[in-house]
Amino acid sequence: MLTGVAGVVAGAASMAVGEYVSVSSQRDAERADLVALERQLQAGAASKAEAERDLAQVHIDRGLPPKLAGQVASTLTNQVEDPAAAHARDRDGVDADNLTSPSQAAAVSLLAFSLGGAAPLATAALLTHDAGLRSASVAVVSLLTLAGMGALSAHLGGAPIGKATARVVLGGCLAIGLTHLVGTYFGVDTT
Protein backbone atom coordinates (compact mmCIF):
# COMPACT_ATOMS: atom_id res chain seq x y z
CA MET A 1 0.00 0.00 0.00
CA LEU A 2 2.82 2.37 0.91
CA THR A 3 4.46 1.65 -2.44
CA GLY A 4 1.21 2.53 -4.21
CA VAL A 5 0.89 5.84 -2.36
CA ALA A 6 4.53 6.64 -3.12
CA GLY A 7 3.93 5.80 -6.78
CA VAL A 8 0.90 8.10 -7.00
CA VAL A 9 2.74 10.95 -5.27
CA ALA A 10 5.85 10.50 -7.43
CA GLY A 11 3.81 10.19 -10.62
CA ALA A 12 1.66 13.22 -9.84
CA ALA A 13 4.71 15.32 -8.97
CA SER A 14 6.53 14.19 -12.10
CA MET A 15 3.54 14.96 -14.32
CA ALA A 16 3.03 18.38 -12.72
CA VAL A 17 6.68 19.39 -13.02
CA GLY A 18 6.89 18.12 -16.59
CA GLU A 19 3.74 20.00 -17.55
CA TYR A 20 5.00 23.17 -15.85
CA VAL A 21 8.33 23.05 -17.69
CA SER A 22 6.70 22.26 -21.04
CA VAL A 23 4.05 24.98 -20.80
CA SER A 24 6.62 27.50 -19.50
CA SER A 25 8.70 26.84 -22.61
CA GLN A 26 5.63 27.30 -24.80
CA ARG A 27 4.75 30.58 -23.05
CA ASP A 28 8.34 31.81 -23.43
CA ALA A 29 8.17 31.06 -27.17
CA GLU A 30 4.85 32.92 -27.45
CA ARG A 31 6.32 35.94 -25.66
CA ALA A 32 9.42 35.85 -27.87
CA ASP A 33 7.19 35.78 -30.97
CA LEU A 34 5.32 38.84 -29.70
CA VAL A 35 8.57 40.72 -29.07
CA ALA A 36 9.88 39.78 -32.52
CA LEU A 37 6.65 40.98 -34.13
CA GLU A 38 6.80 44.27 -32.22
CA ARG A 39 10.39 44.79 -33.36
CA GLN A 40 9.52 43.94 -36.97
CA LEU A 41 6.60 46.36 -36.97
CA GLN A 42 8.78 49.13 -35.50
CA ALA A 43 11.91 48.48 -37.59
CA GLY A 44 10.91 50.75 -40.44
CA ALA A 45 8.60 50.96 -43.42
CA ALA A 46 10.11 48.04 -45.37
CA SER A 47 9.95 45.69 -42.39
CA LYS A 48 6.41 46.79 -41.55
CA ALA A 49 5.35 46.27 -45.19
CA GLU A 50 6.83 42.77 -45.14
CA ALA A 51 4.85 41.91 -42.00
CA GLU A 52 1.72 43.28 -43.65
CA ARG A 53 2.31 41.17 -46.78
CA ASP A 54 2.88 38.07 -44.64
CA LEU A 55 -0.38 38.70 -42.78
CA ALA A 56 -2.26 39.28 -46.04
CA GLN A 57 -0.96 35.93 -47.29
CA VAL A 58 -2.25 34.23 -44.13
CA HIS A 59 -5.73 35.55 -44.90
CA ILE A 60 -5.47 34.59 -48.58
CA ASP A 61 -4.49 31.07 -47.50
CA ARG A 62 -7.63 31.04 -45.33
CA GLY A 63 -9.82 31.84 -48.31
CA LEU A 64 -10.13 35.63 -48.44
CA PRO A 65 -9.82 37.30 -51.85
CA PRO A 66 -6.40 38.98 -52.21
CA LYS A 67 -7.81 42.53 -52.20
CA LEU A 68 -9.83 41.95 -49.01
CA ALA A 69 -6.90 40.11 -47.39
CA GLY A 70 -4.71 43.14 -48.13
CA GLN A 71 -7.28 45.48 -46.58
CA VAL A 72 -7.55 43.33 -43.46
CA ALA A 73 -3.76 43.14 -43.13
CA SER A 74 -3.42 46.90 -43.65
CA THR A 75 -6.03 47.62 -41.00
CA LEU A 76 -4.46 45.22 -38.50
CA THR A 77 -1.00 46.65 -39.18
CA ASN A 78 -1.83 50.35 -39.16
CA GLN A 79 -5.12 51.04 -37.41
CA VAL A 80 -5.39 48.89 -34.30
CA GLU A 81 -4.10 49.67 -30.83
CA ASP A 82 -1.70 46.69 -30.68
CA PRO A 83 -0.64 45.59 -34.18
CA ALA A 84 1.81 42.97 -32.85
CA ALA A 85 -0.97 41.28 -30.86
CA ALA A 86 -3.26 41.35 -33.92
CA HIS A 87 -0.54 39.82 -36.11
CA ALA A 88 0.29 37.17 -33.49
CA ARG A 89 -3.37 36.22 -33.13
CA ASP A 90 -4.09 35.97 -36.86
CA ARG A 91 -0.75 34.60 -38.02
CA ASP A 92 0.27 32.30 -35.16
CA GLY A 93 -2.92 31.76 -33.14
CA VAL A 94 -1.34 33.41 -30.08
CA ASP A 95 -3.63 35.50 -27.88
CA ALA A 96 -1.38 38.13 -26.28
CA ASP A 97 -3.93 38.72 -23.51
CA ASN A 98 -4.33 35.04 -22.68
CA LEU A 99 -0.95 33.30 -22.84
CA THR A 100 -0.69 29.73 -21.58
CA SER A 101 -0.43 29.30 -17.80
CA PRO A 102 2.25 26.87 -16.55
CA SER A 103 0.84 26.86 -13.01
CA GLN A 104 -2.66 26.05 -14.19
CA ALA A 105 -1.40 23.26 -16.47
CA ALA A 106 0.70 21.81 -13.63
CA ALA A 107 -2.22 21.89 -11.19
CA VAL A 108 -4.55 20.15 -13.65
CA SER A 109 -1.93 17.49 -14.39
CA LEU A 110 -1.27 16.92 -10.67
CA LEU A 111 -4.98 16.60 -9.95
CA ALA A 112 -5.68 14.31 -12.91
CA PHE A 113 -2.85 11.94 -12.03
CA SER A 114 -3.82 11.89 -8.34
CA LEU A 115 -7.47 11.19 -9.10
CA GLY A 116 -6.55 8.61 -11.71
CA GLY A 117 -4.30 6.79 -9.25
CA ALA A 118 -6.70 6.95 -6.30
CA ALA A 119 -9.29 4.46 -7.60
CA PRO A 120 -6.88 1.59 -8.38
CA LEU A 121 -5.02 2.27 -5.13
CA ALA A 122 -8.27 2.12 -3.12
CA THR A 123 -9.20 -1.11 -4.93
CA ALA A 124 -5.87 -2.67 -3.99
CA ALA A 125 -6.30 -1.55 -0.38
CA LEU A 126 -9.76 -3.11 -0.13
CA LEU A 127 -8.86 -6.46 -1.70
CA THR A 128 -5.95 -7.59 0.45
CA HIS A 129 -6.76 -11.32 0.83
CA ASP A 130 -6.79 -12.65 -2.74
CA ALA A 131 -3.81 -11.54 -4.86
CA GLY A 132 -5.30 -12.78 -8.14
CA LEU A 133 -8.62 -11.02 -7.56
CA ARG A 134 -6.79 -7.88 -6.42
CA SER A 135 -4.60 -7.81 -9.53
CA ALA A 136 -7.53 -8.35 -11.92
CA SER A 137 -9.71 -5.83 -10.07
CA VAL A 138 -7.00 -3.17 -10.10
CA ALA A 139 -6.57 -3.67 -13.86
CA VAL A 140 -10.32 -3.36 -14.51
CA VAL A 141 -10.70 -0.34 -12.22
CA SER A 142 -7.67 1.27 -13.87
CA LEU A 143 -9.20 0.85 -17.32
CA LEU A 144 -12.59 2.14 -16.14
CA THR A 145 -10.89 5.14 -14.54
CA LEU A 146 -8.97 5.81 -17.75
CA ALA A 147 -12.22 5.60 -19.73
CA GLY A 148 -13.91 8.00 -17.34
CA MET A 149 -11.03 10.47 -17.46
CA GLY A 150 -10.90 10.26 -21.26
CA ALA A 151 -14.64 10.85 -21.57
CA LEU A 152 -14.56 13.73 -19.09
CA SER A 153 -11.64 15.48 -20.77
CA ALA A 154 -13.29 15.06 -24.19
CA HIS A 155 -16.57 16.44 -22.86
CA LEU A 156 -14.85 19.43 -21.24
CA GLY A 157 -12.84 20.09 -24.40
CA GLY A 158 -15.77 19.61 -26.78
CA ALA A 159 -14.05 16.69 -28.53
CA PRO A 160 -15.64 13.43 -29.73
CA ILE A 161 -16.01 11.34 -26.58
CA GLY A 162 -15.65 7.87 -28.13
CA LYS A 163 -12.42 8.63 -29.96
CA ALA A 164 -10.81 10.39 -26.99
CA THR A 165 -11.87 7.65 -24.57
CA ALA A 166 -10.49 4.93 -26.84
CA ARG A 167 -7.19 6.80 -27.18
CA VAL A 168 -6.79 7.22 -23.41
CA VAL A 169 -7.73 3.60 -22.69
CA LEU A 170 -5.38 2.30 -25.39
CA GLY A 171 -2.54 4.45 -24.04
CA GLY A 172 -3.31 3.21 -20.53
CA CYS A 173 -3.31 -0.42 -21.70
CA LEU A 174 0.08 0.08 -23.29
CA ALA A 175 1.46 1.69 -20.13
CA ILE A 176 0.00 -1.01 -17.88
CA GLY A 177 1.32 -3.75 -20.16
CA LEU A 178 4.79 -2.22 -20.32
CA THR A 179 4.88 -1.78 -16.55
CA HIS A 180 3.83 -5.41 -16.07
CA LEU A 181 6.49 -6.64 -18.52
CA VAL A 182 9.26 -4.63 -16.86
CA GLY A 183 8.16 -5.78 -13.41
CA THR A 184 8.05 -9.40 -14.55
CA TYR A 185 11.48 -9.11 -16.22
CA PHE A 186 13.02 -7.83 -12.98
CA GLY A 187 11.26 -10.45 -10.87
CA VAL A 188 8.85 -8.08 -9.15
CA ASP A 189 5.68 -9.73 -7.87
CA THR A 190 2.98 -8.02 -9.97
CA THR A 191 -0.04 -9.63 -8.30
Q: Which role does the model predict for each range below?
A:
Residues 132-144:
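Structural signature of hydrophobic alpha-helical transmembrane segments
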